């Protein structure tokens, strides 16, 4: 550039333009795969039996849960003691809450 403003003659192109592929080749998951991911896991009814923390009598209840959640309940029950309704009534343990 010799003058104050650049002219087209002053600009020298050394590289040639190349075509660019603008096509996106990303693949979206099919509708079958999406349905499998969105389906909730199956819940089953489980019977839970434990001994009363006071008298040792059997305490039973049922829950509806997934298998993974049942494992969490099992670990929790290791640190808790369930109490039967008879012991709650006779020992007046109904504190509410």
UniProtKB/Swiss-Prot annotation:
Localisation per UniProt entry: Host cytoplasm; Host nucleus
Chain positions of motif LXCXE motif: 22-26
Zinc finger (unnamed) stretch: 52-87
Residues covered by region (E7 terminal domain): 1-39
Paired cysteines (S-S): none
InterPro entries: Papilloma_E7
Keywords on record: Activator, DNA-binding, Early protein, G1/S host cell cycle checkpoint dysregulation by virus, Host cytoplasm, Host nucleus, Host-virus interaction, Inhibition of host innate immune response by virus, Inhibition of host interferon signaling pathway by virus, Interferon antiviral system evasion, Metal-binding, Modulation of host cell cycle by virus, Oncogene, Transcription, Transcription regulation, Viral immunoevasion, Zinc, Zinc-finger
A GO MF term: zinc ion binding
Pfam families hit by this protein: E7 (PF00527)
Keyword Oxidoreductase annotated: no
Record remark on domains: The E7 terminal domain is an intrinsically disordered domain, whose flexibility and conformational transitions confer target adaptability to the oncoprotein. It allows adaptation to a variety of protein targets and exposes the PEST degradation sequence that regulates its turnover in the cell.
Described purpose of this protein according to its UniProt entry: Plays a role in viral genome replication by driving entry of quiescent cells into the cell cycle. Stimulation of progression from G1 to S phase allows the virus to efficiently use the cellular DNA replicating machinery to achieve viral genome replication. E7 protein has both transforming and trans-activating activities. Induces the disassembly of the E2F1 transcription factor from RB1, with subsequent transcriptional activation of E2F1-regulated S-phase genes. Interferes with host histone deacetylation mediated by HDAC1 and HDAC2, leading to transcription activation.
Family: Belongs to the papillomaviridae E7 protein family.
Assembly and interaction partners: Homodimer. Homooligomer. Interacts with host RB1; this interaction induces dissociation of RB1-E2F1 complex thereby disrupting RB1 activity. Interacts with host EP300; this interaction represses EP300 transcriptional activity. Interacts with protein E2; this interaction inhibits E7 oncogenic activity. Interacts with host TMEM173/STING; this interaction impairs the ability of TMEM173/STING to sense cytosolic DNA and promote the production of type I interferon (IFN-alpha and IFN-beta).
Annotated protein name in UniProt: Protein E7
Organism: Canine oral papillomavirus (strain Y62) (COPV)
């Amino acid at each position: 550039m010799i003058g104050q403003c650049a002219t087209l003659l002053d600009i020298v192109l050394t590289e040639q333009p190349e075509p660019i592929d603008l096509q996106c080749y990303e693949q979206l998951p099919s509708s079958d795969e999406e349905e499998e991911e969105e389906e909730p896991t199956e819940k089953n009814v489980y019977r839970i039996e434990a001994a009363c923390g006071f008298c040792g009598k059997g305490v039973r209840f049922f829950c509806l849960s997934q298998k993974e959640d049942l494992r969490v309940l099992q670990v929790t029950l290791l640190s808790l003691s369930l109490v039967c309704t008879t012991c709650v009534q006779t020992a007046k343990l109904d504190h509410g809450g």
